[in-house]
Design a protein with these regions (language model features):
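Extracytoplasmic metal-acquisition and chelation regions
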Residues: 1-141
Length: 141
């Protein structure tokens, strides 16, 4: 039934929230650099993540300034940040550029705002995408 499905899904979301909280409780350095837009402000606030991004919020800008790229590259180097993040449907050229200059890797953080046809056909849900994010964070933060 609808009510039972709703309750079950809410329970899964609550469990996932606890998993994120448990994960971040064990992470000393919570600084993330996004070579992309940053539509994750509430997520960052919830889990006390410091972040830097090439574009503010969901900006429609297409190119960051050279100064922004230099700042982010320096930040990655100075703080020993192991990964530069990008979001889904990004060409991640900015993230790749920063990561290459700093000698680190890149990784996808799925905002769950946009889902590809392939993801839909594979049965992607908010919970499954956030579970993937948690695994990616474990591997890259």
């Amino acid at each position: 039934t609808y009510a039972a499905n709703t309750e079950g899904y809410a329970t899964r979301i609550e469990a996932l929230d606890r998993e994120f909280a448990d994960f971040f409780a064990g992470v000393e350095d919570r600084t993330m650099v996004f070579g992309d837009r940053f539509p994750l402000r509430y997520f960052a606030e919830e889990f006390d993540i410091d972040y830097y991004a090439a574009f503010p919020g969901c900006s429609t800008q297409t190119e960051p300034s050279a100064a922004t790229i230099a700042f982010l590259t320096d930040k990655v180097r100075e703080e020993g940040i192991p990964t530069v993040w990008y979001i889904e449907f990004s060409n991640h050229l900015v993230a790749d550029s920063i990561a290459e200059a700093a000698g680190v890797k890149t990784a996808l953080f799925h905002t769950c705002h946009n889902v590809s046809t392939d993801e839909l056909e594979a049965g992607a849900t908010y919970v499954s995408l956030m579970e993937q994010n948690l695994e990616t964070l474990r591997e890259n933060l």
